[in-house]
Amino acid sequence: MGSEMCIRDSAIITIVARMFVVFCCLPVHELAHGWAAYKQGDDTAKKLGRLSFNPFSHLDPIGTIMIFLFGIGYAKPVPINPLKFKNYRKGVALTALAGPLSNLVMSFIFAFIGSGLNRLAGANTAMQLLVLFFGFAANINIALAVFNLLPIPPLDGSRVLAVILPDRAYEKYFRYERYIMIALMVLLFTGVLDTPLALLNNLFHKFIYFLPNLVFGN
């Protein structure tokens, strides 16, 4: 019975954590993109009301479903006008990286809180559930950062390619954006990406949890 309750509680906390990420963390991710673009001279997102914590300004139906199914996904990309950037390539790269960086910052905060609570939890069930929640929230944000750094349209990593690839090659790459996205969905559903994503997640997990583990000795 205790084992069944533990599994049930874990499943519920997983769903709650994913809802929290969808309605609280994804808006921060997209707001980070818009803010970075604004700081680079592009006010497009601000004019369109995308510099907002309102989740309904940012949610993408497919990306949201992916988070609930896989724990990874994406939001509606913040519109930018690279022509307004003070430095085109630098602006595109910084704007693209701002989103995943925000996820890593949030994951560190959640990891720190969860690790601290874990020291205090003892046999307190409510505290243990909070530790579980913050652990899930940290891990989902790590997964989102890793996933969005993949160089696949429309993910953030693909925008960084604008800095690396010649203009002609970059334009040709994005010509097949729709097909590349379909291929990505197939790879996710079939589990082909499970191992490489798990390796990357584990690497970032060790990095994020290094200081919390050092401080709290977990």
Predicted regions and their residues:
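Hydrophobic transmembrane alpha-helices and their immediate loop junctions
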Residues: 3, 8-218
